[in-house]
A protein has these predicted regions:
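Conserved Rossmann-fold NAD(P)-dependent oxidoreductase catalytic core, especially the SDR/UDP-sugar
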Residues: 98-145
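Active-site Tyr-X1-5-Lys
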Residues: 141-163
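NAD(P)H-binding glycine-rich loop region in Rossmannoid oxidoreductase-like domains
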Residues: 53-95, 103-106, 123
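N-terminal Rossmann NAD(P)H-binding glycine-rich loop of SDR-like oxidoreductase domains
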Residues: 1-25
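Residues forming the Rossmann-fold NAD(P)(H) cofactor-binding site
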Residues: 11-14, 94, 150
Length: 163
């Protein structure tokens, strides 16, 4: 199995990479991130890949070259560094996800896993205590991550129709 993991240097990405590298030693894992992958995660079946998810052409090229059977898309910005623009955040969170979806479709990727968040539903006091996929996606205007997760959910609905 060949797996491309975006956001592999992030918290969830590191955990997933560490577990898969040990539990599935015969799998080829492409650890993609704009940041360096920690050395302790670079086992024999892990191949680091410097990838800026906001660069559509780079995403398409990475998927074409890696030829993954599955993609686990974790790349996102939860807590942006000071000074990061809204446009940069959107380019990573939303446009980057669209690029991954399009690359997966273009190159026949069998499985595409994209993480979501309760943030897509927005943080509102009137929300039910328990929410599920039938509740409205509202994001939150004051929290870019929540807005972007809502947008990603919407683009995934379109992707399911298109692909």
């Amino acid at each position: 199995m060949r797996i491309l993991i975006t956001g592999a240097a992030g918290f969830i990405g590191q955990q997933l990479l560490a577990d898969l590298a040990v539990q599935q030693p015969n799998w080829t894992l492409f650890a993609a991130d704009i940041r360096e992958i920690p050395a302790n995660l670079l086992r024999g079946n892990v191949h680091p890949l410097l990838l800026d998810i906001s660069r559509r052409a780079a995403v398409l090229k990475a998927v074409a070259e890696c030829q993954p059977q599955a993609i686990v898309h974790l790349a996102s910005v939860v807590s942006p560094p000071p000074g990061m623009s809204e446009a940069s955040l959107h380019a990573i969170d939303v446009d980057g996800t669209q690029a991954v979806v399009d690359a997966a479709a273009a190159h026949g990727v069998e499985q595409l896993i994209i993480t979501s968040s309760g943030a897509a539903y927005g943080y509102y006091p009137e929300n039910a205590e328990w929410i599920d996929e039938h509740d409205p996606l509202r994001g939150h205007n004051k929290f870019a991550y929540a807005r972007h997760k809502r947008e990603v959910e919407e683009l995934l609905v379109q992707a399911r129709i298109t692909h």
